[in-house]
Amino acid sequence: MGRKWANIVAKKTAKDGANSKVYAKFGVEIYVAAKKGDPDPESNTALKFVIDRAKQAQVPKHVIDKAIDKAKGNTDETFTEGRYEGFGPNGSMLIVDTLTSNVNRTAANVRAAFGKNGGNMGASGSVAYLFDNKGVIVFAGDDADSVFEQLLEADVDVDDVEAEEGSITVYTAPTDLHKAIVALRESGIQEFQVTELEMIPQSEVELTGEDLETFEKLYSVLEDDEDVQKIYTNVDGF
C-alpha cells in the first residue's frame, strides 16, 4: 500500500506542477481555512494542515500568501462544502468533494459530468458506506513497528502502519490525523509525502480497455471542474 500512495503522489505531483487549476483550488481552500480562524498558520491548525498539503503539491508560495492576504481583507465571499456520490463503468465508484461559491452551479456541473461521461450520479450515501474515512500519512522510513509504538505512546488512534520499499504509511482515525502529525514531528520526522484525510475503498476494481478509457474521461472532467476539491474512487491506480 505504501508504494501505491507513493505512485499516486508522484503521478499527481507531476500533473499539479503544470496545472494552474490545482493552485486555484488550494487558494480557495487556504482562503476558507484562514477566514474561519486566525490567518496565522501557527495558531490555526486547520490552516497549517492545508498549507502543508499545498506545499506537498508544489503550490507556489505566492499563491499561498495571496490566499491568506485575501482572507485578511474585508471580502465577504463565502464558500460551501458539498459531497456527491456516483458510479462509473463496471463497478467503479466515485465520491466527489466540492467547495463552491455557487452550490446550484456545482451540483449541475457534477451531475452533467457523470451523465455525459458514462456514469450515473447516485443518492447521498449510495457509495460512501463502501469507503472508510481515515487519516493517511506517508514518509520515508522502514521501521513500522517503531512508528506504531511511538504513535501509541502519544495516544494516537492508529489503524495500521505499513512499511514498503523505503516508505512508511500510517492510517489513523480521521480525528487523530493532526495529533499523529505532531507526534511524528516531535520524534524527528519533518518531511511528509502525504498528509491527507482520505476515503479509502473497502475493495478495489481494476479497469481495462474501454471501461478504463471511459472512467479516465469521467475522472478528468470532474477533476477539471474548478469547484471540485477531491475525488475518491475504488479504481486501482487512482
UniProtKB/Swiss-Prot annotation:
**InterPro entries cross-referenced by the UniProt entry:** Integrase-like_N (IPR017856), TACO1_YebC-like_2nd/3rd_dom (IPR048300), TACO1_YebC_N (IPR049083), Transcrip_reg_TACO1-like (IPR002876), Transcrip_reg_TACO1-like_dom3 (IPR026564), Transcrip_reg_TACO1_YeeN (IPR026562), YebC-like (IPR029072)
Q: List the disulfide bonds.
A: none
Location within or outside the cell: Cytoplasm
Top-level taxonomic group? Bacteria
Name any one Pfam family assigned in the record: Transcrip_reg
Q: What is its main location?
A: cytoplasm
Record-linked HAMAP family = Transcrip_reg_TACO1, Transcrip_reg_TACO1_YeeN
Q: What is this protein called?
A: Probable transcriptional regulatory protein SSA_0586
Q: What is the organism of origin for this protein?
A: Streptococcus sanguinis (strain SK36)
